[in-house]
């Protein structure tokens, strides 16, 4: 939900969130959608994960897709949140917070469809920067870590 919240604060006009209605995440997403509508000018719309018509419609009008689930991460690298790769279009940037594997099925299929893609490695790096500082009180040598980690 942090990604949605920050996107709304940064000026996103509309955010489609797909979740399972039986998950505890659903209630948090519904509460955030309500809160965001009062705090920002962003319209946050909550959809059931299995609503393929809503997914198709949302992707057609979107320029950014972010997978903020663990779907596609080791050990289940065959999983994807977009089972129909014809839904990708070159104007859609696709980001996946998954960092292992570096290119998930979602990112591979999006790239093959001409979409710009980003994996979760930079998010992981910057979470590490913050954790390093909390635990040690020191600044992590980001350039050294980036050089070794991003080879």
Question: Where are the model-predicted features located?
Answer:
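Glycine-rich adenosine-cofactor-binding loop
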Residues: 1-8
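Conserved S-adenosyl-L-methionine
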Residues: 8-15, 112-116
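NAD(P)-binding Rossmann-fold cofactor-contacting core
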Residues: 12-40
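Generic secondary-structure signature for well-ordered alpha-helical cores
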Residues: 34, 38-41, 64, 71, ...
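Short, basic, helix/turn surface patches
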Residues: 41-51, 142-151
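Rossmann-like adenosine-cofactor binding region
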Residues: 42-117
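Adenosine-phosphate binding glycine-rich loop
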Residues: 93, 97-151
């Amino acid at each position: 939900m942090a990604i949605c919240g920050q996107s709304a604060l940064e000026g996103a006009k509309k955010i489609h969130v797909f979740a399972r209605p039986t998950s505890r995440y659903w209630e948090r997403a519904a509460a955030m959608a309500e809160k965001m509508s009062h705090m920002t000018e962003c319209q946050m719309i909550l959809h059931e994960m299995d609503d393929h018509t809503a997914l198709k419609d949302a992707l057609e009008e979107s320029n950014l897709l972010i997978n903020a689930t663990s779907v596609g991460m080791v050990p289940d690298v065959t999983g994807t949140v977009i089972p129909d790769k014809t839904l990708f279009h070159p104007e859609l940037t696709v980001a996946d917070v998954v960092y292992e594997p570096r290119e998930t099925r979602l990112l591979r299929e999006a790239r093959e469809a001409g979409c710009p893609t980003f994996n979760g490695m930079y998010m992981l790096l910057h979470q590490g920067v913050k954790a390093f500082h909390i635990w040690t009180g020191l600044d992590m040598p980001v350039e050294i870590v980036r050089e070794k980690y991003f080879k």
